[in-house]
Amino acid sequence: MADSKMLVPELNDAETMGAETSRFEELLLQASKELQQAQTSRPESTQIQPQPGFCIKTNSAEGKVFINICHSPSIPPPADLTEDELLQMLEEDQAGFRIPMSLGEPHAELDAKGQGCTAYDVAVNSDFFRRMQNSDFLRELVITIAREGLEDKYGLQLNPEWRILKNRPFLGSISQQNIRSQQRPRIQELGNLHTPSSPRPEAGPEKPHLSLWLEAPDLLLAEIDLPKLDGALGLSLEVGENRLVMGGPQQLYHLDTYIPLRINCDESKAAFHQKRKQLMVAMPLLSVPS
């Protein structure tokens, strides 16, 4: 999940602790003000037209099932990990790696023999799809996750055996899909970006201490203690309507927590405070708690 593009240029070394704190306070004020514009600042969903990739054939108790593995540049990519890094992550924490994908609605089609069947369209990021085409491991991983996702979403029980159709990139027609317009909050650096390499933990990622409080009726604040880090480089953060997920570089930290409030994830902001070694997150609320 780590994404260095989430970082912004550091502040000048001459800035003091008070200036850093003031910067974060301004950040929180800005997050609170932007709550008023949340409903008009960005559409809740975006319509995409997935491009064909390849098609796999399997079956369920109801008959033949075809899954069109498609791609779109509008789908966010997963973490840019090597296969060795991914294998190690999956061995240590299977929930620590996610492949963003859009699962389309079932549509009735006819197979090559003119018999009725059901097809599903599953879209992943286009750049990741091209990488997957050159890796049997990634391709099988995507197919496994796509099958499990369809089973969970639609209550299916698919045959674990499947095969990729030759010379047929898709079955039927690929429909447009609506994906949620959600952006990860950028992690701002409060201090310099010098980050010495951190040792890889031997016992898996550590769950950091989290503090939550309401700064205002419409603003929830979070402080995540990260004493092993000196900067935001390698940190990733995902905020959903009632969930906060954070990953640390080299699997030093992992946090996945439920928040019983409706969060405006599109307007959430984050900053790493170097002197305190804390990740601070400002989360405007969609509905004010009573």
From Swiss-Prot:
UniProt main location, coarse: nucleus
Pfam name, any one: PIH1
Biased composition (Polar residues): 34-50
GO CC, alphabetical: cytoplasm; nucleus; R2TP complex; ribonucleoprotein complex
UniProt keyword list: Nucleus, Phosphoprotein, Transcription, Transcription regulation
Region (Disordered) location: 34-53
One Gene Ontology biological process: rRNA processing
Site (Interacts with TELO2): K57, K64, K113
Residues recorded with modification Phosphoserine: S173
Subcellular location: Nucleus
Role: Involved in the assembly of C/D box small nucleolar ribonucleoprotein (snoRNP) particles. Recruits the SWI/SNF complex to the core promoter of rRNA genes and enhances pre-rRNA transcription. Mediates interaction of TELO2 with the R2TP complex which is necessary for the stability of MTOR and SMG1. Positively regulates the assembly and activity of the mTORC1 complex.
Assigned protein family: Belongs to the PIH1 family.
PANTHER family: PIH1 DOMAIN-CONTAINING PROTEIN 1
Subunit structure: Component of the R2TP complex composed at least of RUVBL1, RUVBL2, RPAP3 and PIHD1. Component of the PAQosome complex which is responsible for the biogenesis of several protein complexes and which consists of R2TP complex members RUVBL1, RUVBL2, RPAP3 and PIH1D1, URI complex members PFDN2, PFDN6, PDRG1, UXT and URI1 as well as ASDURF, POLR2E and DNAAF10/WDR92. Interacts with phosphorylated TELO2 and mediates interaction of TELO2 with the R2TP complex. Interacts with phosphorylated ECD, EFTUD2/SNRP116, RPB1 and UBR5 and with RPB1 in a phosphorylation-independent manner.
Description of its domains: The N-terminal region is required for binding to phosphorylated substrates while the C-terminal region binds to the other R2TP complex components.
Full protein name: PIH1 domain-containing protein 1
Organism: Bos taurus (Bovine)
Lineage, broadest ranks: Eukaryota, Metazoa, Chordata, Craniata, Vertebrata
Gene behind the chain: PIH1D1
